């Protein structure tokens, strides 16, 4: 290593079957080395990731996101909380995407180009097929891909019978950003993993360029930047689109459809809204700590800002394994552990709630079955209890093996929207939702997360979130309506589910210096 700290190639370890090469510059490690990549068969891939690791003990994800928002309007942050006292291993952050892909009523917009499509998945699949990446050991679960959302109304592309009777609020059916660079906090190792994807067509040239891009990311992270995120200011209190009376009337109509035999269950939602200025980022900062959840997300693009903490996986694809996590059955949290247990016992004995849960587990099995190998669909866990800051839920896990002819986008078609956000039978329930609800749902009840360059996918259901468009914040929530539902109780359930998000926004609006150690 020379005194200037320029790159040397060093063999660190000789193994029985292979030699592992690293590039070391100064105190930092780049992996894999160019020599290692040249020994691989990359003929099936367009991209390969390379990484640089630095210590992360001097910066937090929140601080870094504040900094990156000064560089780009297009950002995302994905995190998880695995149980009561344990954060997920990784936080993924991105900014300044390579491309932005949206679709609205069959009109696809890719950066500055606009064209018509029959189904947006065909173009999205083309993009992913042009960015096929090798999955390497020693890298985190996400190394680059598409990040964003599929709306609830995306369902219309795979089910033409879904006719829109609601007001069109201009929500994109798809809003995805293409990131070939990823910043990953590894909370276990207390390191930042900087990742760029380089082309496999000219390895020497692209590797040199990739090292430069990693160093540029490192510089941005270390550079002192005055972080000015405009604080959130509510201009009015939240009010519902549907009053209690109007929502209860809608529930009664839903019950009529059930009594007539059209459906067994339908999920009917309401939306709270308020005028506001500033950013939702501080609301996310509060929400991630007051309501930690398996899926926590913040992202912003040209026309929307979203902050949420969802408890529920829509669909996860890891190599060939598909998993979905139906959640149905709800109680408000108690004042203490004893009251919590009483509420849990009551929930598990409630025939209405258990019947609703069983119905939606069956629907999840059926949805997976459409794209899965014969006899591979299994209920992995059944009727577990999940506790969150404001509510208690019943949850199950269903998994299967995807058929060889299908991919992640076919899985989105099969699973979206989730039965827990629509009802059963799904198609008829969605038709009834479109008749009874006043507005398109947009991101609420849709799918949020990533589709990566290796073919994997992790999407949660768009619930327990707030979004901001045109200086208006919206929070949507719904309740599952069955034969013996009590309309007033379902209205209250919607308020309970929205409670954690409303509270986080009001805390951020109050200017509370809510300290976060992560």
Show which residues each predicted segment covers.
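Intrinsically disordered, low-complexity segments enriched in serine/proline and basic residues
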Residues: 4-6, 11-12, 19-20
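Extended alpha-helical targeting/anchoring segments
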Residues: 20, 25-518
């Amino acid at each position: 290593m020379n005194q200037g700290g320029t790159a040397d190639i060093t063999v660190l370890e000789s193994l029985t079957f292979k030699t592992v090469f690293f590039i070391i510059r100064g105190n930092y490690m780049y992996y894999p080395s160019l020599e290692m990549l040249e020994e691989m068969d990359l003929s099936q891939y367009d991209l390969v990731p390379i990484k640089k690791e630095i210590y992360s003990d001097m910066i937090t994800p929140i601080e870094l996101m504040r900094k990156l928002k000064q560089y780009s309007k297009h950002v995302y942050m994905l995190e998880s909380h695995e149980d009561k006292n344990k954060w997920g291993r990784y936080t993924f952050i991105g900014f300044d995407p390579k491309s932005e892909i949206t679709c609205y009523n069959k009109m696809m917009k890719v950066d500055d180009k606009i064209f018509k499509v029959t189904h947006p998945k065909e173009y999205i699949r083309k993009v992913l097929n042009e960015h096929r990446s090798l999955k390497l050991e020693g890298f985190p679960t996400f190394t680059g891909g598409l990040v964003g959302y599929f709306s609830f109304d995306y369902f219309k592309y795979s089910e033409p019978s879904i006719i829109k009777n609601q007001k069109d609020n201009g929500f994109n059916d798809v809003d995805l950003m293409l990131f070939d660079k990823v910043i990953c906090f590894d909370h276990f190792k207390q390191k930042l993993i900087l990742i760029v994807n380089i082309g496999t067509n000219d390895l020497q040239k692209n590797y040199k360029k990739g090292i430069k891009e990693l160093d540029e990311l490192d510089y941005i992270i270390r550079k002192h930047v005055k972080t000015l995120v405009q604080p959130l200011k509510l201009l009015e209190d939240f009010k519902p689109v549907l009053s209690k009376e109007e929502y209860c009337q809608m529930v009664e109509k839903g019950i009529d459809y059930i009594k007539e035999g059209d459906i067994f269950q339908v999920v009917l939602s309401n939306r709270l809204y308020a005028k506001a200025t500033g950013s939702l980022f501080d609301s996310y900062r509060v929400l991630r700590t007051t309501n930690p959840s398996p899926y926590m997300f913040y992202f912003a693009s040209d026309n929307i800002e979203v902050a949420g903490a969802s408890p529920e996986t829509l669909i996860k694809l890891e190599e060939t394994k598909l998993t979905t996590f139906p959640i149905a059955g709800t109680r408000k949290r108690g004042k203490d552990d004893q009251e919590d247990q009483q509420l849990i016992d009551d929930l598990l004995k409630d025939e209405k709630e258990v019947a609703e849960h069983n119905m939606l587990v069956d629907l999840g099995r059926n949805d997976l079955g459409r794209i899965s190998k014969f006899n591979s669909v299994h209920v992995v866990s059944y009727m577990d209890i999940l506790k969150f800051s404001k509510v208690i839920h019943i949850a199950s896990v269903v998994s299967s093996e995807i058929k060889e002819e299908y991919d992640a986008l076919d899985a989105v078609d099969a699973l979206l929207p989730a039965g827990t956000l629509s009802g059963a039978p799904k198609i008829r329930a969605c038709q009834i939702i479109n008749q009874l609800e006043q507005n398109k749902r947009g991101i609420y009840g849709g799918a949020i997360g990533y589709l990566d360059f290796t073919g994997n996918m992790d999407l949660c259901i768009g619930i327990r979130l707030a979004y901001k468009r045109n200086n208006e914040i919206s929070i949507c929530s719904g309740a599952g309506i069955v034969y013996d539902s009590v309309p007033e109780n379902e209205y209250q359930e919607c308020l309970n589910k929205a409670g954690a998000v409303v509270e986080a926004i009001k805390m951020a609006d109050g200017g509370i210096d809510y300290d976060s150690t992560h």
